[in-house]
UniProtKB/Swiss-Prot annotation:
<dbReference type="GO" id="GO:0009432">
    <property type="term" value="P:SOS response"/>
</dbReference>
<dbReference type="Pfam" id="PF08459">
    <property type="entry name" value="UvrC_RNaseH_dom"/>
</dbReference>
<dbReference type="InterPro" id="IPR004791">
    <property type="entry name" value="UvrC"/>
</dbReference>
<dbReference type="InterPro" id="IPR050066">
    <property type="entry name" value="UvrABC_protein_C"/>
</dbReference>
<protein>
    <recommendedName>
        <fullName>UvrABC system protein C</fullName>
    </recommendedName>
</protein>
<dbReference type="GO" id="GO:0005737">
    <property type="term" value="C:cytoplasm"/>
</dbReference>
<keyword id="KW-0228">DNA excision</keyword>
<comment type="function">
    <text>The UvrABC repair system catalyzes the recognition and processing of DNA lesions. UvrC both incises the 5' and 3' sides of the lesion. The N-terminal half is responsible for the 3' incision and the C-terminal half is responsible for the 5' incision.</text>
</comment>
<dbReference type="InterPro" id="IPR038476">
    <property type="entry name" value="UvrC_RNase_H_dom_sf"/>
</dbReference>
<dbReference type="GO" id="GO:0006289">
    <property type="term" value="P:nucleotide-excision repair"/>
</dbReference>
<keyword id="KW-0267">Excision nuclease</keyword>
<dbReference type="Pfam" id="PF22920">
    <property type="entry name" value="UvrC_RNaseH"/>
</dbReference>
<dbReference type="GO" id="GO:0009380">
    <property type="term" value="C:excinuclease repair complex"/>
</dbReference>
<dbReference type="Pfam" id="PF01541">
    <property type="entry name" value="GIY-YIG"/>
</dbReference>
<feature type="domain" description="UVR">
    <location>
        <begin position="203"/>
        <end position="238"/>
    </location>
</feature>
<dbReference type="InterPro" id="IPR000305">
    <property type="entry name" value="GIY-YIG_endonuc"/>
</dbReference>
<dbReference type="Pfam" id="PF02151">
    <property type="entry name" value="UVR"/>
</dbReference>
Length: 607
């Protein structure tokens, strides 16, 4: 603890009631948030002279101030603790990295509604199903609905402006309601069947379709009978894949696993006896590395901090924690629903539990192995470059454009544990000659390292540039102009064969040219980072180019600003459909007069 903090004086005035405590460092940064049944007893445990875990000792050494909030009971303390953790994300708490809202399947309103993925507030008029553990789980369900019932999933703006069926109709994934090729009542029946599937009533749906198939066959409507037969076959195949033997209710199976270096929580979501999907979580491990602490922290953040998430009737867990009764009470207070947490289970439920444990163990092992793999490559690179120790931060830059159009520079960052995606950056390049990669790189590096000079960001140990001597020399010029401290510059250029494994490398002033063997771990690291920079630049360039092409044609029209351009494109479903529209059709768009429609039409057909 710091010199200004006196634990004895603090504890002498500390309450013995339930509450929440907050620990701060000398710069008033929040380090840790905790709750306690008895604040004085809990806080006293931090200042014992023996028996402290290393991470707890590291936390205590930084404490300069402790604040407490007394609560009426433990439940209130847990609710306040979770609120503070979610808001401040203290570095010594166990934190869920992925705290995004879970996705739902959304069924829109109207005569021919669409199914889509939805996140966030439920403001749109329609019906919501879920939440699902991941967007991937939703895509699987939507794909099945397309194959089985051929319900539409296109955007409304696209749907409203179709004049002929799209490719989805040709491959039997949609019945083309956009051009009237299906009756409303037939489509409504397909939607009703889709809803039955999403609600977990697959058995009732299969029985209903079987009855309809027999009726169609008895009236010699063999085409309809064959269609129903195919639907039943698809549904039964999915039922076999997704069913949990012996399961009929709503259950989340949660397993936590901790190893030196990390933790993993695996969640399997079962609704109506059907597996909606599963997901791995890798919480940031704080001062507590006990598996029960990880489980308790996960359940608190997952269900208490995010009350919009779907709550099953039961949780099956692989470890128990003394806070579970308080957690159940907090959930009951928030949701008005009772939750059962089961640990000692038998039969099928025990197999579910073991499956979750196995997945958590394997996922964490794979993650740690990948970290070790990347770390070994960093060590190999240090050996190749004759460094005293492996670099901790490597930045790579690349440029992407289409004949000089929509030029974008990318910056990706890697450390010994892998990519640091929160530090990735893209730079939209402006004011340079089209296709001048040197000028584009100069601008990107200048913008990046000017911020560093102003005290923003971190200095990399190695700067990797995708290019040869010219790009490397230009990078050196930028660093000299900005008086950036010495750092290692590494250029990577395609070799004479332009094949992977034959790259030519240039170090610092480009005078040092060398190659590495194709099986060199150091070369593999360079290739990995270069390819990631290339991918990141291309995706940014394509997005920028697409946006430019969608709007640039309308930018010269007086009276059509950014908002009106967006509204026009949304109304017609894109620039191509707008180009096909007549003056009268354009004038029917919201906010467009006949005179403005004439200007827009003339601009679109000026060539």
């Amino acid at each position: 603890m710091t010199e200004q903090f006196d634990p004895s004086a603090f504890l002498s005035t500390c309450s013995g009631r339930p509450g929440v405590y907050r620990m701060f460092d000398s710069d008033a940064r929040l380090l840790y948030v905790g709750k306690a049944k008895n604040l004085k007893n809990r806080l006293s445990s931090y200042f014992r002279k023996t028996g402290q875990a290393p991470k707890t000792a590291a936390l205590v050494a930084r404490i300069a101030q402790i604040e407490t909030t007394i609560t009426a009971n433990e439940t209130e303390a847990l609710l306040l603790e979770q609120t503070l953790i979610k808001e401040w994300r203290p570095p010594y708490n166990i934190l869920l990295r992925d705290d995004k809202s879970y996705p739902y399947v959304f069924l829109s309103d109207g005569d021919f509604p669409r199914f889509s993925i939805h996140r966030g507030a439920k403001k749109q008029k329609g019906k919501y199903f879920g939440p699902y553990p991941s967007a991937g789980a939703i895509r699987e369900s939507l794909s099945l609905l397309q194959k089985t019932f051929m319900v539409r999933q296109c955007e409304d703006s696209y749907y409203k402006n179709r004049t002929r069926p799209c490719l989805q109709y040709q491959i039997k994934r949609c019945k083309a309601p956009c051009v009237g090729l299906v009756e409303p009542e037939v489509y409504a029946e397909d939607v009703r069947h889709s809803v039955m599937f999403l609600e977990g009533r697959s058995n009732a749906l299969t029985d209903e379709l079987s009855t309809a198939m027999e009726a169609a066959a008895s009236t010699l409507d063999f085409e309809k009978a064959a269609e129903l037969r195919d639907q039943i076959s698809l549904l039964r195949r999915v039922q076999d894949q997704q069913s949990m033997e012996g399961g009929t209710g709503d259950v989340d199976v949660v397993a936590a696993f901790v190893n030196p270096g990390g933790a993993c929580v695996h969640l399997i979501s079962v609704r109506g006896g059907r597996v909606l999907g599963s997901k791995n979580f890798f919480p940031q491990v704080g001062i507590e590395e006990d598996v029960a602490e990880v489980m308790s922290a996960f359940l608190g953040q997952y269900f208490v901090s995010s009350p919009e998430r779907d709550l099953p009737s039961e949780l099956i867990v692989n470890v128990v924690h003394e806070d579970f009764p308080t957690l159940i009470a907090a959930i009951d207070e928030l949701r008005g629903r009772e939750l059962t947490i089961s640990h000692r289970v038998r039969g099928t439920r025990a197999r579910w539990q073991q499956l979750a444990v196995t997945n958590a163990e394997q996922a964490l092992s794979a993650r740690l192995a990948n970290r070790q793999h990347v770390a070994a490559r960093f060590e190999a690179l240090a050996e190749v470059l004759n460094l005293d120790e492996p670099p901790q931060r490597l930045e790579c830059y690349d440029i992407s454009h289409s004949s000089g159009e929509a030029t974008v520079a990318s910056c990706v960052v890697f450390g010994p544990e892998g990519p640091l995606k929160s530090d990735y950056r893209r730079y939209n390049i402006e004011g340079v000659t089209a296709g001048d990669d040197y000028a584009a790189m100069h601008q990107a590096l200048t913008r990046r390292f000017s911020k560093l000079k102003d005290g923003e960001g971190k200095l990399p140990d190695i700067l990797l540039v995708d290019g040869g001597k010219g790009q490397l020399s230009m990078a050196r010029d930028v660093l000299n102009e900005l008086a950036v401290p010495d750092l290692i510059l590494l250029g990577v250029a395609k070799g004479a064969t332009r094949k992977a494994g034959f790259e030519t490398l240039y170090l610092n002033d480009a005078a040092h040219e060398f190659t590495l063997k194709g099986d060199s771990p150091a070369l593999h690291l360079i290739q990995q980072i270069r390819d990631e920079a290339h991918r990141f630049a291309i995706t940014g360039h394509r997005a920028r180019r697409g946006k430019t092409r969608r709007t640039s044609t309308l930018e010269g029209v007086a009276g059509v600003g950014p908002k009106r351009r967006r509204d026009l494109l949304k109304h017609f479903g894109g620039l191509q459909e707008l180009s096909r529209a007549s003056i009268d059709e354009i004038a029917k768009a919201p906010g467009i007069s006949k005179k403005l429609a004439e200007l827009i039409y003339a601009n679109l057909h000026s060539e």
